[in-house]
Swiss-Prot record:
Residues 1-64, 113-127, 173-303, 358-640, 685-690 are cytoplasmic. Phosphate binds at residues 390-391, 537-538, 565. One of its GO terms (molecular function) is ATP binding. The lineage of its organism: Archaea, Methanobacteriati, Methanobacteriota, Archaeoglobi, Archaeoglobales. Pfam families: E1-E2_ATPase, Hydrolase. It is a multi-pass membrane protein. The gene is copB. Optimum temperature is 85 degrees Celsius. It comes from Archaeoglobus fulgidus (strain ATCC 49558 / DSM 4304 / JCM 9628 / NBRC 100126 / VC-16). This is Copper-exporting P-type ATPase B. SUPFAM superfamilies: Calcium ATPase, transduction domain A, Calcium ATPase, transmembrane domain M, HAD-like. Its EC number is 7.2.2.9. Keywords: ATP-binding, Cell membrane, Copper, Copper transport, Ion transport, Magnesium, Membrane, Metal-binding, Nucleotide-binding, Phosphoprotein, Translocase, Transmembrane, Transmembrane helix, Transport. One of its GO terms (biological process) is copper ion homeostasis. The chain crosses the membrane at residues 65-85, 92-112, 128-148, 152-172, 304-324, 337-357, 641-661, 664-684.
């Protein structure tokens, strides 16, 4: 939509359609300020600067044109008659003509240039209408100055251009907020880093860092790159990047994201990713692609805007002809035609959707919800069913204690004894029991004569008594019968360990893949908005049934092999518009098959090819957030399209003079004010999306 400078297409920080906002200008040349790998990140900032430069240009043209309009108003006979004074001297008419010419060519330049850009692309729109309207008024008035019979429209022309310039300036200010989110992401990144080299700290530009370098991050500083902590411990604030509200604890071996804010500890970070591979750059690229991708709704709005332009030009011409035939007053007929063209607002139609998209994709990105496919995001509003992969999505993918049953010991005693014995074991079950004891604040008791029983469990003396923590297989070997409560736990697919005291069963501890605390809230939120919740798992049916009952799922599919997941999704699709939620690795075909594929828990690796939407955090509640945002986005689009269509349907006949007999007639200046307001309303409504 623009003449592009050396930055090319990549310079766009928002939708191609967003360029309608400022299609009346060329890019100003930018200096290349960074090396190639840092360049894309700066493009959106450059584009924002360019947008601001254009705003300033409109403001400057508005001020100059307004100053020139003052003498035009004073010298205009119509204004003199209205205000009851007379200013006339030799050549005053020619001075009026020269001042009006200056306003037409200087103030009207963006619109005059815009018509050539639009016609060259064969996409007449807003600029075409304004340019035709001011040109008709200017050349007709000029002809009157040089002998044609009639009245001139110089003061109307000048005020019309002033209002158009001001309207576009206000509109661009309103719109800038939509495209500012990407610039904010870019601003997060620090420009310098403390490189550790030969035992010394060297200040270097971030773009000069390479994988393997080690950088020092001091307390309160922003982390300059994606990397791995090799020294130090701290809490890191990632809220601006992933939407994670609480600071995240970081220790050696943990990954950190460039742009996150370090807490009170110092960290030494080994550089892992630079340039376009960094998390932030990938997010910026995904948001840019989402904002530039077209959707059916947008195509419809674009066609409607083009059609509206043709209608306005046609109605303007017909209005001119009808009024000429009706009252044979050429000046009056010209004024009606000009008003029709300036009051029509294809801009409001053209911006109705891209503005909302720019706001919603940016809002989503800041919350760690990355939209890769805009059409899929729009489909999310129609979802009827969501299928979750179990392991790592609804559950944590690791053992946790779910039940403790004591026969002659309290739960707390049993847990403390079991944890004390298991503390020396590396087994995942042992780790889960110790973790549960720590969580409940129990200290470990000293164990004497500790011994591991290979493949069966552990034993030792605690508080003078011999205890064992053993598997069900060992219990069978001993010929010990278990009661109903134990059998019930087994039927739920849980792993059960027995605690024996002096050879007798004192109690059992049941463990299972731990259900995420957020899963219950996520499922209840989705069900509250009328969406059926289902689960796919390769796990056995007992485990699947237990998880489904715990979470209140509508249905579940157990013992499904990875290659069968896509088939199950297809089955559900026969009844419902379906989303699939998984980690994007072993369920890639299922994500691709679903109407909306959602990869969850992507962390810093956001380039999940098969997913339409990527959720950075491992939080199922974000699925409900995506559906809600999709519905709100669609609602805003509808509001904007309804407003833009309704406004034009009402304004065009009014401008043509259908209520002339009732004494209602709009001047071109009033038409221009209404047109500007209609676009600003669309922009403000889009920004109200939350």
């Amino acid at each position: 939509m623009h003449e592009h400078d050396s930055h090319g297409e990549a310079a766009h920080s928002n939708s191609e359609d967003m360029q309608m906002i400022h299609q009346h200008h060329e890019h100003h040349g930018h200096e290349e300020e960074h090396s190639a790998h840092h360049e894309k990140m700066k493009h959106s900032a450059d584009h924002g600067d360019h947008h601001r430069m254009m705003m300033e240009d409109f403001k400057k043209r508005f001020y100059v044109s307004t100053l020139l309009t003052i003498p035009i108003l004073i010298l205009s006979p119509a204004i003199q008659t209205f205000l009851g004074f007379r200013v006339e001297f030799a050549g005053s008419l020619y001075i009026l003509f020269l001042l009006s010419s200056a306003v037409y060519f200087y103030g009207g330049y963006p619109f005059l240039k815009g018509i050539f850009d639009e016609l060259r692309r064969r996409q007449p729109g807003m600029m075409t209408l304004i340019a035709v309207a001011i040109s008709v008024a200017y050349f007709y008035s000029s002809a009157v100055v040089f002998g044609l019979k009639g009245k001139f429209f110089f003061w109307e022309l000048a005020t019309l251009i002033d209002i158009m310039l001001l309207g576009h300036y206000i509109e661009m200010r309103s719109v800038l907020g939509a495209s500012r989110a990407l610039e904010e992401l870019v601003k997060i990144m620090p420009s310098e880093a403390h490189l550790l080299k030969d035992g010394e700290i060297v200040e270097v530009k971030v773009e000069n860092l390479k994988p393997g370098d080690k950088v020092l991050v001091k307390p309160g500083e922003k982390i300059p790159v994606d990397g791995i902590v090799v020294e130090g411990e701290s809490f890191v604030n990632e809220a601006m990047l992933t939407g994670e509200s609480k600071p995240v604890a970081k220790k050696p071996g943990d990954t950190v994201i460039g742009g996150a804010i370090n807490g009170e500890g110092s960290l030494v970070v080994e550089v892992e990713k630079t340039g376009k591979d960094t998390y932030l750059n990938q997010v910026i690229e995904l948001v840019r692609q989402a904002q530039e991708s077209k959707s059916r709704t947008q195509d419809l709005a674009n066609r409607a805007a083009l059609l509206l332009t043709v209608i306005a030009l046609t109605v303007g011409s017909v209005t001119l002809a009808i009024w000429l035939a009706y009252i044979a007053d050429f000046a009056f007929a010209i004024e009606r035609a000009v008003t029709v063209m300036v009051i029509t607002c294809p801009h409001a139609l053209g911006l109705a959707i891209p503005l909302v998209v720019a706001v919603s994709t940016s809002l989503a990105a800041k919350s760690g919800l990355l939209i890769r496919d805009r059409q899929a995001f729009e489909r999310a509003k129609d979802l009827q069913a969501v299928i979750f992969d179990k392991t790592g999505t609804l559950t944590e993918g690791r053992f946790g204690v779910t039940d403790i049953v004591g026969f002659n010991h309290s739960e707390d005693e049993l847990l403390q004894i079991a944890a004390s014995l298991e503390a020396r074991s590396e087994h995942p079950i042992a780790a889960a029991i110790v973790e549960e004891a720590e969580k409940r604040g129990f200290g470990l008791t000293e164990v004497e004569e500790f011994r591991a029983i290979p493949g069966k469990g552990v034993e030792g003396i605690v508080n003078g008594r011999r205890y064992m923590v053993v598997s069900p297989g060992y219990i069978r070997e001993l010929g010990i019968k278990t009661d109903e409560s134990v059998e019930k736990l087994k039927q739920q697919g849980k792993t059960v360990v027995f605690i024996l005291k002096n050879g007798e069963v004192s109690g059992v501890i049941a463990l299972a893949d731990r259900i995420r605390p957020e899963s219950r809230e996520a499922i209840s939120k989705l069900k509250a908005i009328g969406i059926k919740c289902m689960m796919l798992t390769g796990d056995n049916r007992f485990v699947a049934k237990w998880v489904a009952e715990e979470l209140g799922l509508d249905d579940y599919f157990a013992e499904v092999l990875p290659h069968e997941k896509a088939e199950k999704v297809k089955e559900v699709q026969q009844k419902y518009v379906t989303a699939m939620v998984g980690d994007g690795v072993n369920d890639a075909p299922a994500l691709a098959q679903a109407d909306v594929g959602i990869a969850i828990g992507a962390g810093t690796d956001v380039a999940v090819e098969t997913a339409d939407i990527v959720l950075v955090r491992n939080d199922p509640r974000d699925v409900a957030a995506i559906v809600e945002l999709s519905r709100k986005t669609y609602s805003k689009m509808k509001q904007n399209l309804l407003w833009a269509t309704g406004y034009n349907a009402f304004a065009i006949p009014l401008a043509a003079g259908v209520l002339y007999s009732a004494g209602i007639l709009l001047s071109p200046a009033v038409g221009a004010i209404l047109m500007s307001l209609s676009t600003v309303i669309v922009a403000i409504n889009a920004r109200l999306l939350r």
